[in-house]
Amino acid sequence: METVLSAPEVFIALVVAAHAAVLALRLSISLYEA
């Protein structure tokens, strides 16, 4: 199984992962402060 990712696909994946991490962090902070 070989997966060839182009630079734009890798960049998009990193942006999506970072966005999800930020949302999860904000959610955990809001729950912690509640």
Swiss-Prot record:
Pfam families: PsaM (PF07465). Coiled coil: none annotated. The chain crosses the membrane at residues 4-24. Its main location: membrane. It is found in: Cellular thylakoid membrane. GO terms for cellular component: photosystem I; plasma membrane-derived thylakoid membrane. HAMAP family: PSI_PsaM. Belongs to the PsaM family. This is Photosystem I reaction center subunit XII. It comes from Synechococcus sp. (strain CC9605).
